[in-house]
Design a protein with these regions (language model features):
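Short pre-active-site segment immediately N-terminal to redox-active cysteine/selenocysteine motifs
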Residues: 56-58, 63-66, 139
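Short, internal strand/loop/helix patches
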Residues: 90, 102-139
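A short beta-strand-turn-helix
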Residues: 37-58, 81
């Protein structure tokens, strides 16, 4: 009987810890606040500073070359960035090697800037898994976030929250 109680107690504690962690990831601390400062450097050497994009809605996508779901959503983001010139799309390459980033860029071309993070961090946004996408309004406020691969209809929903 004592062993059963210990096992049940352990299961309860693990379940509680998992739930608390995932609840925090579902509501990153940046929601409703100014987006933390973040900049990327493209393969062409240009720096894109997300905080300088105020005045235009921003879709900020954290990804990595080794992330299967990131590859899955790549075409959706590329198509949306071409269709929505009123929205700035930025890809923040995360926890990757330079060669992994370069190979990914060659295999999955897109028109929006992407590159490794050179200012700020994914942690400041509360990223707990990849891909993670943040939707920032024209005033620089993080309106929504989504963790996991975006499909076209989900992306359209979130674009509606930041586009006028």
């Amino acid at each position: 009987m004592g062993a059963v109680a210990v096992v049940l107690g352990a299961v309860l504690m693990l379940s509680l810890a998992w739930g608390l962690q995932h609840a925090a990831l579902a509501n990153p601390p940046v929601l409703g606040r100014m987006a933390p400062k973040l900049a990327i450097q493209t393969s062409g050497g240009d720096q894109v500073r997300v905080w300088e994009l105020q005045g235009k809605p921003v879709v900020l996508n954290f990804w990595a070359s080794w992330c299967g779901p990131c590859v899955e959503e790549g075409g959706v983001l590329a198509d949306a960035s071409s269709a929505h010139s009123d929205v700035a799309f930025v890809g923040a390459n995360n926890q990757d090697t330079p060669s992994g980033f370069q190979a990914f860029e060659l295999r999955h071309p897109h028109s929006y800037p992407a590159g490794p993070i050179v200012t700020g961090s994914y942690q400041a946004f509360g990223v707990g898994g990849l891909p993670a996408t943040f939707f920032i309004d024209a005033q620089g406020i993080v309106v929504a976030s989504f963790t996991g691969p975006l499909d076209a209809s989900t992306l359209d929903h979130y674009l509606g929250l930041i586009s006028s």
